[in-house]
Amino acid sequence: RLADWLAVRWGDTDRIMVAGSGAVLLQKALTDRGVPGRGVVVADTGVYVEACQAFLEGVRSGVVSHPRADSRRDMLDIAVRSAVQKRKGSAWGWGSSFKDGSEVPLEAVSLAFLGAKMARRKRRERSGRKRVSVV
Protein backbone atom coordinates (compact mmCIF):
# COMPACT_ATOMS: atom_id res chain seq x y z
CA ARG A 1 0.00 0.00 0.00
CA LEU A 2 1.07 3.54 -0.72
CA ALA A 3 0.56 4.74 2.86
CA ASP A 4 2.84 1.97 4.17
CA TRP A 5 5.51 2.76 1.58
CA LEU A 6 5.46 6.49 2.41
CA ALA A 7 5.34 5.95 6.18
CA VAL A 8 8.48 3.80 6.06
CA ARG A 9 10.31 6.59 4.21
CA TRP A 10 8.98 9.43 6.36
CA GLY A 11 12.24 9.71 8.31
CA ASP A 12 14.05 11.00 5.19
CA THR A 13 11.26 13.28 4.03
CA ASP A 14 10.30 16.76 5.15
CA ARG A 15 6.89 16.99 3.49
CA ILE A 16 4.47 14.66 1.78
CA MET A 17 2.27 16.55 -0.67
CA VAL A 18 -0.94 14.67 -1.49
CA ALA A 19 -3.47 15.63 -4.13
CA GLY A 20 -6.43 14.18 -5.91
CA SER A 21 -9.61 12.39 -4.96
CA GLY A 22 -8.05 10.18 -2.28
CA ALA A 23 -5.86 12.84 -0.67
CA VAL A 24 -7.74 13.18 2.62
CA LEU A 25 -7.95 9.40 3.04
CA LEU A 26 -4.22 9.07 2.36
CA GLN A 27 -3.49 11.84 4.86
CA LYS A 28 -5.47 9.95 7.53
CA ALA A 29 -3.75 6.66 6.66
CA LEU A 30 -0.36 8.36 7.03
CA THR A 31 -1.19 9.94 10.39
CA ASP A 32 -2.53 6.55 11.55
CA ARG A 33 0.94 5.18 10.71
CA GLY A 34 2.72 7.80 12.78
CA VAL A 35 3.49 10.49 10.21
CA PRO A 36 2.91 13.86 11.94
CA GLY A 37 -0.03 15.84 10.57
CA ARG A 38 2.21 18.85 9.88
CA GLY A 39 4.25 16.66 7.53
CA VAL A 40 1.35 15.87 5.21
CA VAL A 41 -0.01 18.69 3.05
CA VAL A 42 -3.30 18.10 1.25
CA ALA A 43 -3.19 20.13 -1.93
CA ASP A 44 -6.58 21.79 -2.01
CA THR A 45 -7.32 24.36 -4.71
CA GLY A 46 -5.46 27.12 -2.87
CA VAL A 47 -2.31 25.03 -2.41
CA TYR A 48 -2.51 23.81 -6.02
CA VAL A 49 -2.79 27.35 -7.40
CA GLU A 50 0.06 28.53 -5.16
CA ALA A 51 2.20 25.61 -6.40
CA CYS A 52 1.56 26.39 -10.07
CA GLN A 53 2.38 30.07 -9.61
CA ALA A 54 5.49 29.37 -7.50
CA PHE A 55 6.83 26.91 -10.06
CA LEU A 56 6.26 29.28 -12.98
CA GLU A 57 8.03 32.07 -11.07
CA GLY A 58 10.88 29.65 -10.29
CA VAL A 59 11.29 28.76 -13.95
CA ARG A 60 11.17 32.39 -15.07
CA SER A 61 13.74 33.45 -12.44
CA GLY A 62 16.10 30.57 -13.27
CA VAL A 63 15.72 28.91 -9.85
CA VAL A 64 14.18 25.81 -11.45
CA SER A 65 15.89 23.79 -14.16
CA HIS A 66 15.47 20.32 -15.63
CA PRO A 67 18.37 18.17 -16.89
CA ARG A 68 18.53 17.63 -20.61
CA ALA A 69 16.75 14.45 -21.61
CA ASP A 70 15.34 12.83 -24.73
CA SER A 71 12.50 15.34 -25.01
CA ARG A 72 10.45 12.99 -27.18
CA ARG A 73 10.19 10.53 -24.28
CA ASP A 74 10.59 12.64 -21.17
CA MET A 75 7.11 13.05 -19.68
CA LEU A 76 7.95 16.34 -17.99
CA ASP A 77 9.33 17.82 -21.23
CA ILE A 78 6.18 16.72 -23.06
CA ALA A 79 3.96 18.23 -20.35
CA VAL A 80 5.89 21.52 -20.44
CA ARG A 81 5.69 21.75 -24.25
CA SER A 82 1.93 21.28 -24.13
CA ALA A 83 1.33 23.40 -21.01
CA VAL A 84 -1.33 26.07 -20.96
CA GLN A 85 -2.72 28.09 -18.10
CA LYS A 86 -6.34 27.12 -17.44
CA ARG A 87 -8.52 29.53 -15.51
CA LYS A 88 -9.78 28.21 -12.18
CA GLY A 89 -12.09 30.94 -10.93
CA SER A 90 -9.94 34.01 -10.39
CA ALA A 91 -6.72 31.95 -10.46
CA TRP A 92 -5.18 29.47 -12.87
CA GLY A 93 -3.72 25.96 -12.96
CA TRP A 94 -1.92 23.81 -15.50
CA GLY A 95 -3.67 22.32 -18.50
CA SER A 96 -2.54 20.61 -21.70
CA SER A 97 -2.95 21.91 -25.23
CA PHE A 98 -2.43 18.41 -26.70
CA LYS A 99 -5.53 16.28 -27.29
CA ASP A 100 -4.01 13.31 -25.46
CA GLY A 101 -1.60 15.37 -23.36
CA SER A 102 -1.35 15.38 -19.60
CA GLU A 103 -0.49 18.17 -17.21
CA VAL A 104 0.06 15.70 -14.34
CA PRO A 105 3.90 15.63 -14.50
CA LEU A 106 3.96 19.43 -14.42
CA GLU A 107 1.49 19.50 -11.52
CA ALA A 108 3.65 17.00 -9.62
CA VAL A 109 6.86 19.03 -9.96
CA SER A 110 4.94 22.20 -9.10
CA LEU A 111 3.74 20.61 -5.85
CA ALA A 112 7.24 19.26 -5.13
CA PHE A 113 8.71 22.72 -5.65
CA LEU A 114 6.17 24.29 -3.29
CA GLY A 115 6.78 21.52 -0.74
CA ALA A 116 10.52 22.22 -0.87
CA LYS A 117 9.86 25.94 -0.42
CA MET A 118 7.62 25.20 2.57
CA ALA A 119 10.33 23.01 4.09
CA ARG A 120 12.91 25.78 3.69
CA ARG A 121 10.56 28.21 5.38
CA LYS A 122 10.43 25.94 8.40
CA ARG A 123 14.24 25.89 8.72
CA ARG A 124 15.12 22.23 8.41
CA GLU A 125 18.24 22.48 10.59
CA ARG A 126 16.58 20.58 13.40
CA SER A 127 15.78 17.54 11.29
CA GLY A 128 18.20 17.64 8.38
CA ARG A 129 15.46 16.27 6.13
CA LYS A 130 15.75 17.22 2.52
CA ARG A 131 13.17 15.36 0.42
CA VAL A 132 9.60 16.16 -0.49
CA SER A 133 7.31 13.36 -1.68
CA VAL A 134 4.46 14.17 -4.06
CA VAL A 135 1.59 11.72 -4.42
What are the residue ranges of the model-derived segments?
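RNase H-like, metal-dependent nuclease domains and their acidic two-metal-ion catalytic environment used
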Residues: 1-42, 49, 53, 67-135
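Short, surface-exposed amphipathic charged segments that create phosphate/polyanion-binding patches used
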Residues: 51-61
